[in-house]
Amino acid sequence: MERVRDFSPYELKVSVYDGAAEKRTMLMDGHLYMVKFGYDAAPQEEHPSRTSYVNLPVNEYIGSKVFAASGIPTQDVILGDYKGRSVVACRDFMYEMDPNLMLLHFKQLEISMPGGSSRSKARPDWEFVSQVLDEHDALEGIRARARHRFLQMTCVDALIGNFDRHANNWGFIADRRTADILDLAPVYDCGSSLSPSLSREGMRERVEDPQQMREANMAAPYMAMNVGGKRRKFAFFLTSETARPFRAELPELWPRLSEEVTDRIVEQTPGLDDLQRVFYKATLDARRKYVLGPAYRMALKEAETSTATVGNDTLATDIVPGIPFPGLGGNPGLLH
């Protein structure tokens, strides 16, 4: 298991990164890092269980590790302490690349679409996101991969309960001289997940009451995306007809995000106490069962129906021998 790293001896400089949370820049062992701090929020009378964002570094760490386990390239993260404060160091993947390369956020594609400046929002519409993915000429070389990434990223965000995957929180690697998009960027910014503002008392209440754990994860969070003009809960969206292409990714992702996998990630997270370990394991398990599970079972049935339909069509269709027919073969897997 990794240990919590003491970053106190290192000089932290002004942040060169955007975003709301407190952050600084650190050079360590030849690598550049964005250092994110946990922090206390003012108590809210209407939400007494949401009084602290001190868990944000841990949530960034666990969320990033879950993404990495899913097979999606993800930022490297190190949990640490800076002069008594909890922090997470996120390695700047651009720092070690060719200086002629730059990170291009999806937001920049939105506003460069015809009429995009009026349709690009802090919380994007799925219909517009889909149009950008399908039509933007800058994606010509990686269009299929970009759509695949967004669909899978949304599914993993549903597992970790990330409510902040807006258009500035994912993107591409581009040539700054020509603005040509060359590749997908690793996933970054996963801190707004796993109930980052929940107090220890709130954690304890959920751990001690499985029904509350289930209901809390079914009810929240909302996605950082509108669908049909409304912000949707992950659980509602993933079982809707609109989400069919999203849940079609779940049979591939499911074995990579099993209970064994996420439990191991939590066990290997340094610095957690017993309550936190139980809470994070139980939260990921609840979200897998109640948010992803129904959509996964739908995806299996839809795949079976699609295969059966293709099979029936095949009987009545003249097919040139030796040419594979799409949709045949492949075991979608079993629900664990």
Residue ranges and their predicted role:
Residues 77-83, 166-175, 300-302:
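Short alpha-helical "patches" and their helix-cap loops
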Residues 93-155, 159, 240, 264-269:
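ATP-dependent phospho-/nucleotidyl transfer catalytic cores
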Residues 55, 127-199:
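Conserved kinase catalytic-core segment
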Residues 2, 7-11, 126-141, 199-201, ...:
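A short, terminal or domain-edge coil/loop segment
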Residues 1-117:
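Conserved ATP-binding subdomain of kinase catalytic cores across diverse folds
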Residues 176-327, 333-335:
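C-terminal catalytic region of ATP-dependent kinase domains
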Residues 90-100, 160, 166-167, 172, ...:
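An exposure/low-complexity boundary signal
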Residues 61-69, 148-157, 282, 286-289, ...:
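A broad, structural surface signal
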